[in-house]
Amino acid sequence: MAFLQEARQFIPQERIYTDELRRLAWGTDDGFYRLIPQIVIRSEGEEEISRLLKLAGRHTLPDTFRAAGTSLSGQAISDSILIVAGKHWEGYSISPDHEEITLQPGIIGQRVYELLAPFGRKFAPDPASVKSAMVGGIVMNNASGMNCGTHANSDKVLLSARIVLADGTVLDTGDSVSRAAFEVTHRDFIRRICTLRDEVRADGKLAERIRYKYSIKNVTGLNLLPFVRFDDPFDIIAHLMVGSEGTLAFLSQVTMKTEYDYPCKASAMLYFKTIKEACRAVVAMKKLTGANGEWTVKGAELLDWKSLASVSDPVFLKYKGEICSSTLPGVEPGDETGLTAVLTETKARSTEELRQNIRAIEQCLSAFQTYTPVCFTDKPEEYSKYWAIRSGSFPSVGGTRKPGTTC
């Protein structure tokens, strides 16, 4: 095809795959969709991306971007042109005060943790696939993970983005020279962004609905919150990238705030005989705050009986045995579907503060019926096992489904 012939003029043949085997391999992600790309191109730089997008536009061919391919809903597969940005996209820089980090899309999330750990800082988004997922996918899919919630997801910690638009234009929203040039070359683009912003804000009901939608955990669909959060059109453009799944632009670099990493941590796996009781306990724990006004509970992850069964949780197996052989108060004989776990984490700046947090949580939970005693551990080798269970629960549940089904 003409596109391929032109692409070979600036992309070496060894980085262009058209054979059936490698196209099949690259047409796979962590979801259940199957699309086989016609061409796979391993990109190595921003200039290549710009030229590829302009070329695809001339030939009216769709293209899809892929980093690690750990997405669950088909974001990283294509039946047209698949542009891979993994290897050779691993650059980074950390600000002198360690409060900002600039990243290319191909660096793995776990690697970012390792880079920041010596400075007592961390990368806030923490998807379960963080040991494989890359920054490009984490940001563009708004993969918020288990602990960052809504207060520290990609949208909240993003400061600026360097992107390549469909026409090949490179825009760095954190660079004044780039912004000024873009205002000249894309004046109408900026005008339309501002018009959308003003229309959204003029509709009070819509604006309030958007604020509410993003006050709860929400990682699907295009991110509309920037239209009510920001005045500057370049801030809006940068934050529109979060959750866009690569449909609006290619993310070549992102600058994000880092988060303070508490040195003292403790976790507990709390078990309840009903999911209702577990949810009531979570609501109560959310109200706990320390002397400094910070939340006492930093993370609370609910695992239903199916999640526990999929990882052969020992407490679930014990519970299942008990209800089969005897009757537990408030539980129907043989009904194993009620047991619910809440993986709870608290963090502190000192061991004394950590002990105070644990006591406050234990006191709060005394008003609820737990299946097992509340037992926090501050030993990393112990609580890391709890979080490994949580990280592994999704693929484990998926593994229990019947062949050929998707749920």
Model-predicted segments: where are they?
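Glycine-rich anion/phosphate-binding loop at the beta-strand->alpha-helix junction
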Residues: 134, 141-142
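C-terminal substrate-binding/cap subdomain adjacent to the FAD-binding core in PCMH-type
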Residues: 138-140, 147-154, 158-391, 395
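Short, hydrophobic/aliphatic alpha-helical segments
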Residues: 49-62, 116-129, 133, 221-242, ...
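Short, acidic, Ser/Thr-enriched surface-loop or helix-capping motifs
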Residues: 71, 96, 134, 165-166, ...
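N-terminal flexible segment immediately upstream of the FAD-binding catalytic core
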Residues: 1-58, 68-99, 128, 151, ...
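N-terminal glycine-rich flavin-associated loop
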Residues: 7, 31-63, 81-128, 143-195, ...
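Glycine-rich, histidine-containing beta strand-loop boundary motifs that form or position
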Residues: 20, 65-69, 76, 105, ...
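Short secondary-structure capping/junction motifs at helix and strand boundaries
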Residues: 62-66, 120-127, 297, 368-374
